[in-house]
Amino acid sequence: MRNILLCENMTKVQKEVRCDHCGTSQGSKSVFSGQKVFLGRKITDVLETITHRSIPSSLPIKICFVCTSTFMSSAALIEKVRETVDRVQEQPAKKTKVAEIEEPSTQESDKKAVKVPKKNTTLRQRSKSIAAFPPSFVNGANTNTEIEIISASPKKLDKTPKKQISRLFEDNLNDSVKLTPAKEVSSTKKAFLNLFGNGGNDAIEVLTESEEEEDSDKGPITINTNNFQCPECEFHAKFPKPYKEHLQKEHGLQRPRIYPCTLCIKTFGVLKTLKNHLRDTHSRTFESEAKTKAKESKEKEAKSGAKNKIDAKAKETNAVSQRKKPKEKKSKEKKTEIKCNVETKVVDEIDDQVNNKKGTDSEDADQTQATKIASFKALNESLMKKRMLENVIDSEYTFAINGSSASTPRADSNNFQCEICDCELMTAKQMQEHMKTVHSIDKPKVFKCHVCEKSLATKQSLKTHMTLHADGAEAPNSSKRKILQDEDEDVDILGTTQIENTAEKVEGPKKSQQSPTKAAKFTNRKILQEEDEVVEIVDAFKTDNTAEDDEGPAEEKIIRSRNNIQHQVDGGMIAPRSPAKKTKKTSHVDLSVSTTNGNSPAKSEKRKKQDKSEDTLPSSDVDIVEEINYNVRPHKKARLESIGDSTADESTLSCDRCGKFVKSRQRLDSHMEKKHAAKLQCTLCKEVYQNQMDYVAHFSNCGSEGGLPCGVANCKKVFTEANFLSSHLRKRH
């Protein structure tokens, strides 16, 4: 029981809250916070009316019920006092209005007593409203009040010029007009003021000033972009970048705006935005100070040059006129007239010359521009025709392909179409992303051959593939690209080759040709490489017309074959390869020489010919031969691509582990090295796996808290999920 009572007392103590105003502690229900409403008003609003301060709504104030009731009564008292003060302040204003109404009535009573001649009816129309007041109100006014009202009326009339003018007319003027304009005359009353001869000059001046302002507004705005002064310190910079860095580092401005607009308050951080702002909002152009200075200097030079020319012409004419002067004296007036006429004539002549020059220059410029435009048009027409022909494919068009029944077929569109969902996209990159995201194909083959409909992954591979079709169309009987296996032996072909030939290797009859004169002939070295079969080398040498050498230039045919006897060729010049084909591996070349005479020549004769040809070779050819790299090997990637593209009677090979089919032995070796040669060793359990799937699957039993490491020796990557690891092993290793 004691414990229960203690708990109840504790709860009572906790619920009691202390008042901030009177300090008494009461229950939480009888205490009001700042947000609570008492008799339709918040406690904070009541405190603001009493203290005349702005009190935040989140003020942690607590007031008891008694204090809040006293605050409410004091707030009501303050509001009542305000109302009485406002009511008292409004009463004097009403009395002054009554005084203003009484003033014209007293003046009218005085005017009735004294006989006054008639006034202008137009000026007395304002005083007709006085008849509305009773006569007792007018007669009962005291003289003292009249004097006070009259003395006080001009002070109020200063604020209203219309009333002041009317009162002055009624009091002081008889059949006369006096104008007292206000400080600023409105535009609507300028015409009325001009009737009396005043304000005309002002209006003209205003118009001229406005016109000048409009003319000045149309010109470009010049801003100095090479002088930046910090307004907060003495920092000075010539370029914007260091000035921005200074404002960011020293003054803490995150985005400093260093280009202010001279026509408004806005500032900009980039000069381009300032130019756009001036163009769009103010319809003005921007010019730097350097450009304006250059323009001004050019204008000054042009003006000074024109003045100098005019002065020189005037001096010349004066000298001529002085020589041709008659002896008779003329009056000063005639002399001045002659001088003026001469100067005007000189100016007219200069203007005519300038106009003639401009006309001739403009005609020449028009002629040159016309020729240029004609040439440009011709070039553009030829280029457009070429582009149109390039867009049209050589294959036969049908209306069914284009999907139209028009009389003229259209060129195929360059859009890429998905074979799965028939989606058309503009670029190859978009199609690749579409195939990856929508159809989940890792390596999409987007480029398609229009001849054999083979799909390829890159544009370069499509080009190399198209060369195969082009080679097949040009030479259908020639065999396709052959892979030459011996890489270390190079074929060097020169115009002067040393060949050991016998009578058994002669293939054709000798052709006898005689040189008609002893004149020297040009050495022409033509190396013609046919489609992987025949290379013809034609050498025309300088020969002497002797009994021993009656033979003309020899034509040598070098035929590549596998079964003939191999001869190593000495020399240094390699036969150029066609640019469309890829680099091929060089190997042994079997040579069979067809000489130009009836019998096979002796070795001594050939050696003599060789010595002569070497003597006749120019020094430039020798230098070129010496600079040639004889041991050129194709790049590994190009070699592998040529191996992969070759289809010359190759049997397909298959991998004994995964069953993949390849077309060459080197492809199979590279596949074995990449996929099956690497051993995967787990860094956690130290087990070795040959298969990638087994290695990834063993992590279900092995602890994978620290991640899934790549099992390759030199690879240190770690992955969080198994699919990431498997894709890494499949693509990289």
From Swiss-Prot:
The modification Phosphoserine is found at S109, S153, S176, S600, S642, S646, S654. The keyword tRNA processing does not apply. The modification Phosphothreonine is found at T180, T188, T647. Zn(2+) binds at C19, C22, C64, C67. GO terms for molecular function: DNA-binding transcription factor activity, RNA polymerase II-specific; rDNA binding; RNA polymerase II cis-regulatory region sequence-specific DNA binding; RNA polymerase II transcription regulatory region sequence-specific DNA binding; zinc ion binding. GO terms for cellular component: nucleolus; nucleus. It is found in: Nucleus; Nucleus, Nucleolus. A zinc finger (C2H2-type) spans 228-251, 259-282, 416-439, 447-469, 653-676, 708-733. Residues 17-91 form the ZAD domain. The keyword Phosphoprotein applies. Disruption phenotype: RNAi-mediated knockdown produces various phenotypes that are the result of reduced rDNA copy number. These include a decreased number of progeny, a progressive loss of fecundity over successive generations, and a number of offspring from male knockdown mutants, exhibit a bobbed phenotype (abnormal cuticle patterns on the abdomen) which is characteristic of decreased rDNA copy number. In addition, the offspring of knockdown mutants display reduced rDNA magnification, a process by which an X chromosome with insufficient rDNA copy number is induced to recover copy number. Residues 592-602 have a biased composition (Polar residues). Gene3D superfamilies: Classic Zinc Finger (3.30.160.60). Keywords: DNA-binding, Metal-binding, Nucleus, Phosphoprotein, Repeat, Transcription, Transcription regulation, Zinc, Zinc-finger. Residues 90-100, 285-316 have a biased composition (Basic and acidic residues). GO terms for biological process: maintenance of rDNA; negative regulation of transcription by RNA polymerase II; positive regulation of transcription by RNA polymerase II; regulation of transcription by RNA polymerase II. Residues 90-121, 285-336, 499-525, 540-622 are annotated as: Disordered. Named after the Hindu god Indra who lost immortality due to a curse from Durvasa, likely referring to mutants displaying a loss of germline immortality. Required for rDNA copy number maintenance and non-random sister chromatid segregation (NRSS) following unequal sister chromatid exchange. Binds ribosomal DNA (rDNA) preferentially binding to intergenic spacers (IGS) regions on both X and Y chromosomes. Essential for NRSS, a mechanism which contributes to the recovery and maintenance of inherently unstable rDNA copy numbers so that the integrity of the germline genome is upheld over generations and germline immortality is sustained. May be involved in transcriptional regulation. Belongs to the krueppel C2H2-type zinc-finger protein family. This is Zinc finger protein indra. It comes from Drosophila melanogaster. The lineage of its organism: Eukaryota, Metazoa, Ecdysozoa, Arthropoda, Hexapoda. The gene is indra.
